[in-house]
């Protein structure tokens, strides 16, 4: 699969909040990138998605009962 197709899939997953899948897709895209700038971009997006996953961005937690 070419870089651009995988990058598009990664971006769509990221926009949908599927950060685990997006991080894996960005990592794979980085490995396919022919241009250094594309590789760096994909690595940065992967790192952002991994951070979002760790910090549970977009996860709605139930309120604790008092």
Predicted regions and their residues:
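Inward-facing hydrophobic residues that define packing positions of alpha-helical scaffold repeats
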Residues: 26-27, 33
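Hydrophobic/aromatic side-chain positions at a characteristic register within alpha-helices
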Residues: 14-15, 34
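Conserved small-residue packing positions in alpha-helical repeats and bundles
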Residues: 10-11, 30, 47
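Alpha-helical linker/edge segments of TPR/alpha-solenoid repeat scaffolds
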Residues: 46-66
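TPR-repeat structural position
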Residues: 19-20, 39
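Boundary/linker segments of alpha-helical solenoid repeat arrays
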Residues: 34-42
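Alpha-helical junction/boundary sensor with strong preference for TPR arrays
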Residues: 32-33, 53
């Amino acid at each position: 699969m070419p870089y651009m197709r995988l990058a598009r899939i990664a971006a769509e997953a990221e926009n949908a909040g599927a950060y685990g899948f997006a991080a894996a897709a960005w990592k794979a895209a980085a490995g396919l990138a022919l241009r250094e700038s594309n590789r760096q971009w994909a690595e940065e997006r992967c790192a952002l998605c991994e951070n979002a996953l760790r910090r549970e961005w977009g996860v709605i937690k139930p309120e604790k009962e008092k």
